[in-house]
């Protein structure tokens, strides 16, 4: 899920023993957790799969009693922890498959800026940060200022954004990437946003400092400072506010410091 840690999953099998993955989560009326949204996303994911992108094949979507269910192909592998340079190299190449020339009527930039200035449905929440601590309030003020200073039309629409492209949504067997999962947040947008997400979360995955700097340089070569600042502000708000709601104060303080560190770089 785009807001993180919000879904459940189990492996199921049919009468013939064919195994699939069943995911489900509580719907809350948000823009990203409806049956209609999932049905809009699946053609986007299938478009990627047609290019060789290792996302799971979608089998079924259903809803019942405020729960949303997704049945999909079970892919091999486990999240790569530690995240190694060989994994990052493959993920950067897979990210190229997300590139395409397709307009969205300004939807991507408006959506991204809105998450900064007012928040989103169920994630990027402002109140938890404002109430958490002076450090949380300071980060929120910084994020809002970035959102207000960002021209939505200037944020590139260059293909498809997975929108939750961190190492725990990657599967690998040894050095080889075998899958990209949790694609329910995919949307027309900027594939480079996903590389910012990967970078922002890469220290948690154990990627070394030198390798993080290499990925950062790649991003600086591809996008201007204003775009990277907006993307990092989104990730800072998203992870810090989620932590303020769901984690202890020490964990939240760590995310707050991590966020300020990355924002200071742009």
Language-model segments: which ranges?
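ATP-binding glycine-rich phosphate-binding loop
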Residues: 1-14
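A conserved alpha-helical element in kinase catalytic cores
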Residues: 19-65, 78-94
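Active-site Asp-x-Gly
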Residues: 158-161, 171-215
